[in-house]
Amino acid sequence: MASKIFFVLAVFLVMSAVLPESFAGCKKLNSNCSRQYRECCHGLVCRRPNYGNGRGILWRCVKAKK
């Protein structure tokens, strides 16, 4: 029984190391983000959107350009 619990914990630790965005509650599209942390969901990047009048002030999660 103890080995099964240990196995589940080991799998969880490996998964959280490999897929941090799925466990840490990643930031969705257009959410505020901070540049130094990779907190946007998979396929999103943290950028300052350009709203036509220069650069935006807030960093947001936006779709990464291919």
UniProtKB/Swiss-Prot annotation:
Keywords: Acetylcholine receptor inhibiting toxin, Cleavage on pair of basic residues, Disulfide bond, Knottin, Nematocyst, Neurotoxin, Postsynaptic neurotoxin, Secreted, Signal, Toxin
Compartments where found: Secreted; Nematocyst
MF term (GO), any: acetylcholine receptor inhibitor activity
Record has Hydrolase as a keyword: no
Primary residence: secreted
Signal peptide location: 1-24
Organism superkingdom: Eukaryota
S-S bridge residues: C26-C41, C33-C46, C40-C61
Function of the molecule: Alpha-toxins act on postsynaptic membranes, they bind to the nicotinic acetylcholine receptors (nAChR) and thus inhibit them. This toxin competes with alpha-bungarotoxin for binding to orthosteric sites on muscle-type T.carlifornicus (IC(50)=408 nM) and human alpha-7/CHRNA7 nAChRs (IC(50)=14.16 uM).
Record remark: domains: The presence of a 'disulfide through disulfide knot' structurally defines this protein as a knottin.
Name recorded for this polypeptide: Alpha-actitoxin-Ms11a-1
Organism: Metridium senile
